[in-house]
Amino acid sequence: MARAAMEAAATVVLALALLGAAARGAASDDFNLGDALEDPNMKPTPKAPTPKKPSGGFDLEDALPGGGGGGAGEKPGNRPQPDPKPPRPHGDSGGISDSDLADAAGQGGGGAGRRGSGDEGGHGGAGGAEPEGTPQGLVPGVVAAVVAAVAGAVSSFVAYQRRRLCFREGGSAPV
């Protein structure tokens, strides 16, 4: 009896919800396919004029080398150039120093026989075609996927065999 009352109440609530949605949809003009089509009589809006460049103050083109194609009065040679840093020789002491970071970044600072200067096109530094860690990141993912697939297959097979043995009759011969 209680189940019949619950089903009747659910039916009434569902009917009221559908009736409310239908009434709201008929009264609203929110969705109209005519809104998606352009009016053929509309003229394109004119573009706003570009603002004039300020005469002084902060300018992003100052950060670009050579002025960024700047104004008429600027010359590319007016900006002071930083002094180039001479390479610092260092020995193979076995430790890590700041010059090792400069070698890896390809900024020089390496002694003779170092592979990280980047100018020889060796494996270290920025001169290489691809980073050394890229292939290493691919292999563990593939191995993990294969191991997960094999583990799933084995567990599935074991569950199938247990189910098969569970329903076997005690006195019958193996099939």
From Swiss-Prot:
Signal peptide range in chain numbering: 1-28
Predominant location category: membrane
Extracellular topological domain residue ranges: 29-137
A Gene Ontology cellular-component term: plasma membrane
Bias-annotated ranges (Gly residues): 65-74, 106-115
Membrane topology: Single-pass type I membrane protein
UniProt KW keywords: Membrane, Signal, Transmembrane, Transmembrane helix
Cytoplasmic topological domain: 159-175
Keyword Iron in record: no
One annotated GO biological process: myeloid dendritic cell activation
Highest rank taxon of the organism: Eukaryota
A matching Pfam family: CD99L2
Membrane-spanning intervals of the chain: 138-158
Function: Involved in T-cell adhesion processes. Plays a role in a late step of leukocyte extravasation helping leukocytes to overcome the endothelial basement membrane. Acts at the same site as, but independently of, PECAM1.
Subunit-structure text: Homodimer. Interacts with PILRB.
Family to which the UniProt record says this protein belongs: Belongs to the CD99 family.
Name of this chain's protein: CD99 antigen
Gene source species: Mus musculus (Mouse)
Lineage, opening ranks: Eukaryota, Metazoa, Chordata, Craniata, Vertebrata
